[in-house]
Amino acid sequence: MSIKEDKWIRKMALAHGMIEPFADGQVNVDAETGEKLISYGLSSYGYDLRLSREFKVFTNVYNSLVDPKHFTEDTFISITDDVCIIPPNSFALAHSVEYFRIPRNILTMCIGKSTYARCGLIVNVTPFEPEWEGYVTIEISNTTPLPAKIYANEGIAQVLFFEADEMCEVSYAERKGKYQKQQGITVPFV
């Protein structure tokens, strides 16, 4: 497997709709206000995706048990805003602004941005498999004993694109993966 460079990412985004909307280059300042942003957009060997304005913040209001086989959404509070406050030692789910369409010979890995990591916020996103498409559901954990703020429409994680040496026998789309074409924040289900 080899990692793909900015020229390839740009070509695939513009000619094949691999990333929509696509920011051609790193955006780190709001063009209207001049305010500094946590960067997003095309980088040398990846693409920094953004958080949308929709969040689900974990809460234990109902004294629930977290069970991935029998998950209930009442463990979350839904928020739509430009920022989200994650309680201490808790987490939030969000989704990307960008919609991704992954080619059959590509697998991605997603790594949290250092700006958030240095604040004790850990981003977890599973790989985008060959021929997966959709908005990315993103998990952000606050490992600190203090509340933490995350920002909508700013960078949260970098997607790295790896080209396989050989084509896979069965793609995510062909095996009818359960998170194919997900819209918005998708909670776990079996």
Swiss-Prot record:
Residues that, per the record, bind dCTP: K113, S114, T115, Y116, A117, R118, Q158, Y172, K181, Q182
Any Pfam family hit: DCD
Active-site feature positions: E139
Protein name: dCTP deaminase
Record-stated family: Belongs to the dCTP deaminase family.
Entry keywords, A to Z: Hydrolase, Nucleotide metabolism, Nucleotide-binding
InterPro entries: dCTP_deaminase (IPR011962), dUTPase-like_sf (IPR036157), dUTPase_trimeric (IPR033704)
Function: Catalyzes the deamination of dCTP to dUTP.
Gene: dcd
Molecular functions (GO terms): dCTP deaminase activity; nucleotide binding
Family annotation (CDD domains): trimeric_dUTPase
Superkingdom of this protein's organism: Bacteria
GO annotation terms (biological process): dUMP biosynthetic process; dUTP biosynthetic process; nucleobase-containing small molecule interconversion
Reaction(s) this enzyme catalyzes, per UniProt: dCTP + H2O + H(+) = dUTP + NH4(+)
Complexes and interactors: Homotrimer.
EC numbers on record: 3.5.4.13
PANTHER family membership: DCTP DEAMINASE
Pathway as given in its UniProt record: Pyrimidine metabolism; dUMP biosynthesis; dUMP from dCTP (dUTP route): step 1/2
